[in-house]
């Protein structure tokens, strides 16, 4: 009944595994005699131990499923956040801003002398440069947050490894001394699941009751000893170098699973498929393509005063192109809208600039290709994350079907034990009544 109460009290405790008293019947005591002593009843019941009703195979399945789920969930969440920030397709997206920019040049080609059309084109250009810079900053901020989370995750793994090692020692000592370390095992399994979710670690219960956790094939925890992981790599997306994990002795630890593995994949360099670095590169490429294509045509024209056209966009050196893109002209008089010798009312250069938006290798095509690529990869990551999460839920459900506490079952067990106690009490009462008759009433006949 005490154990039933323990199960019921911990019904909602995370990681708790239900327990059961294991009993066996005691045989009749042996009697040394030259004569037959006849049939003898057994000596009752023996409590052999308190069993923890867990399943090591199901526990291992949960750890594996959590590792896969952690990886794809981390990747999908980062990709979805980046995709949402693009706001494509919508009126707030960069594609719409580019369309308005080219339309403004088309208006200028029709009305080269219009101050309003020139002002609209310049305003549209400034809106594009601002949105490119804002988009790039959003990506770099997301990258920095993800990079900081790598440090936090590694610290969490190291702390959990130390706790698991300490619990391993306590569990081993308890088993050797004949104790029941069930609650300690529950705490250890919960920590092991957290480590698996973060790193995709695999585990094996040894013959002495300790749990060995391995990351990248090497032991993170073995017995009462734990190893630590370290993080090296840049703190800025502009560095373009990978963030790596290593053991304390400097040996690389390749983590390709769990939330940590997913986050490392997200912040990887663009050449290695990093979604954030890839998006940052798209912003830089767009800024460079926009400046190159527009400046090439703009320099071929002349202003209303007949002066040669200069650069329309400028990219300041010493930093990312997306952040350093700016608009050079400040008014209509600095816009080169006409071809040389065609007159001040010619708008052929403006028309040529407007046509850049339709080029197959133009800024629009580059941006749309980057957005489409991100959308495809995000959809794939979301799909795999959904499947991995379903696998984790199924594995956890299977584990709980064996290890979880069922309130109805425990209530039935409590009633069973209560009935057994009542029956045992009735046996004692019957024996007491028989002894009373034997002692107090025997030999009274005839008095």
Show where each model-derived region lies.
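Structural signature of extracellular appendage/secretion-system components
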Residues: 1-447
